[in-house]
Amino acid sequence: MTKSQGFQFKQFFIAHDKCAMKVNTDGILLGAIADIRHKRQILDLGTGTGLVAIMLAQRTDENTQISALELEPNAYRQAVENCRNSAFSDRLQVYQGDVLDYHFHQKFDLIVSNPPYFSESLASRSYERDLARAATQSHLDWLLQAKKWLAEQGEISFILPFEAAEKLVEQSRTSCLFCTKICKIITKQGQAAKRMIVSFSAQNVPLEEQELVIYDADNQYTEAFKQLTKAFYLNM
């Protein structure tokens, strides 16, 4: 397949020719950074191609089950295809539905999402892309819904543009959730952070903060980024 049809990782292939949102660095970072320790039930909200769900399946053992939820029909079918074709298919289940309307009858130890972040004013060229990125529902809506499905000791992790993440952290203070981890994503050494992975829990534990720089001053991948992604990227 060509790059426009999909992306080859070390242990799986992600087709994205039917999905408005393609394989991107945000999803790869979330899939590589999310804390999987002691997590047996994992949920990926707005899974798109299924990339993050499959990455988490690779990182966990046979005792961990991963569920994924996607609204847009083409993306849902693509995620089903990608999960079915992966070596982890027996631990992956994709559901179709709206995050705010869906009903899961179980609790999850880890809930992750690379959610919509474009505002309604940033109209795009296709209905599917609007559906994938126009945030007609707020990030707080998604966070509060995720809270309903969260196990007592569980964790929610979102990757968002920096300003949106800061806003969500502020909003979360009235939701009985605590921000437990912040990872600032810096594209190039010396630049300001443009993305952030923020994690929340019902447990009031000390905040962990870190930074990840993707490229050094010479436009080469940093050692930290290479170590983080070497289990996934073919040439890392």
Curated annotation (Swiss-Prot):
Gene3D superfamilies: Vaccinia Virus protein VP39 (3.40.50.150). Keywords: Cytoplasm, Methyltransferase, S-adenosyl-L-methionine, Transferase, tRNA processing. Pfam families: MTS. It catalyses: adenosine(37) in tRNA1(Val) + S-adenosyl-L-methionine = N(6)-methyladenosine(37) in tRNA1(Val) + S-adenosyl-L-homocysteine + H(+). Its EC number is 2.1.1.223. The keyword Electron transport does not apply. Its main location: cytoplasm. It is found in: Cytoplasm. One of its GO terms (biological process) is methylation. GO terms for molecular function: nucleic acid binding; tRNA (adenine-N6)-methyltransferase activity. Disulfide bonds: none annotated. It is an enzyme of class 2 (transferase). InterPro entries: DNA_methylase_N6_adenine_CS, SAM-dependent_MTases_sf, Small_mtfrase_dom, tRNA_Adenine-N(6)_MTase, tRNA_adenine-N6_MeTrfase. One of its GO terms (cellular component) is cytoplasm. Specifically methylates the adenine in position 37 of tRNA(1)(Val) (anticodon cmo5UAC). Belongs to the methyltransferase superfamily. tRNA (adenine-N(6)-)-methyltransferase family. This is tRNA1(Val) (adenine(37)-N6)-methyltransferase. It comes from Actinobacillus pleuropneumoniae serotype 5b (strain L20). The lineage of its organism: Bacteria, Pseudomonadati, Pseudomonadota, Gammaproteobacteria, Pasteurellales.
